C-alpha cells in the first residue's frame, strides 16, 4: 500500500478547552489515486492533511508512505523527506513577491533531484506567456497556477491540497480543478485534497467523508466526472 494511515488521534488544548480533533483514523490510499477529504469545518480534515504532510504530529497512530513511517523519522530526515517527496498547495498562494512566475516555480525545482522540465510545465500551466511577470501582475487564478507549478515541479510522490479553490470564483475554480486533474493524469502524483465543496468529490478516485474527527464514509468513485463537467 502506497499510503497507510492507522489509528491516528489528535487533540488540542487542555482541561475545559480540550478538543479531540481526530478520533482514530484508518485510511489506505493507492499510488496515483486522487483522494478527496470532504467534510464541514471542524471535521478534522485539514489536521489530517497536515499530519500526512509531516507539518503536524499525531498523538498516537502511524503514517506509512512507501514503506517509511513518518513518526520514526528524526526532524532532519523528515524535513528532507518533505522537501523531496511532498508538494503542498494551499488556499493562499504564498508566492515570493519579488520573483517572477518562472523564478517562483524554479524555487521548487531547486529542492528536487528529479525536477520536471520548467518550460514544459509552464506550457501545461498556461503560464508560458506570463513567465516574466511578478505575482502582483497576475490574476488570482494565475497566482494559484504558479503555486501549483512550484509544488509539482519537484515531481513529488504526493501532492497535498488544502482548499486550493477556496479563494477563487466559480470559473477560475473549475480551471484550477481541471489543471489538478491534468497533473494527476500526466504525472501520476498521488493527490490528497481537502475541501468542503461537495461537488468536487465527483472527480475523485476515492472519497473520504469526515465528521467530528471520524471517517463516516470511505468509498471508491465508480463513475468519475471530468472537472470540466462539475457544477455547484
Tell me the role of every PLM-derived stretch.
Residues 214-232:
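Conserved beta-strand-loop-alpha-helix hinge in the C-terminal portion
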Residues 2-204, 209:
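ABC family nucleotide-binding domain
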Amino acid at each position: 500500500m502506497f499510503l497507510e494511515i492507522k489509528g491516528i488521534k489528535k487533540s488540542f488544548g487542555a482541561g475545559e478547552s480540550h478538543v479531540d480533533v481526530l478520533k482514530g483514523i484508518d485510511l489506505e490510499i493507492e499510488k496515483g489515486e486522487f483522494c478527496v477529504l470532504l467534510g464541514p469545518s471542524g471535521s478534522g480534515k485539514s489536521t489530517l492533511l497536515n499530519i500526512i504532510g509531516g507539518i503536524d504530529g499525531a498523538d498516537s497512530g502511524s503514517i506509512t508512505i512507501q514503506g517509511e513511517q513518518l513518526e520514526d523519522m528524526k526532524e532532519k530526515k523528515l524535513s528532507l523527506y518533505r522537501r523531496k517527496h511532498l508538494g503542498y498547495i494551499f488556499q493562499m498562494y504564498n508566492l515570493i513577491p519579488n520573483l517572477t512566475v518562472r523564478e517562483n516555480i524554479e524555487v521548487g525545482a531547486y529542492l528536487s533531484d528529479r525536477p520536471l522540465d520548467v518550460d514544459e510545465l509552464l506550457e501545461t500551466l498556461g503560464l508560458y506567456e506570463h513567465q516574466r511577470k511578478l505575482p502582483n501582475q497576475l490574476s488570482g487564478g494565475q497566482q494559484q497556477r504558479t503555486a501549483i507549478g512550484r509544488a509539482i515541479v519537484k515531481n513529488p510522490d504526493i501532492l497535498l491540497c488544502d482548499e486550493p479553490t477556496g479563494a477563487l470564483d466559480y470559473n477560475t475554480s473549475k480551471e484550477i480543478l481541471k489543471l489538478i486533474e491534468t497533473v494527476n493524469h500526466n504525472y501520476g502524483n498521488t493527490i490528497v485534497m481537502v475541501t468542503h465543496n461537495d461537488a468536487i468529490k465527483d472527480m475523485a478516485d476515492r472519497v473520504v467523508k469526515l465528521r467530528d474527527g471520524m471517517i463516516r464514509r470511505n468509498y471508491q468513485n465508480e463513475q468519475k466526472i471530468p472537472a470540466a463537467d462539475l457544477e455547484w
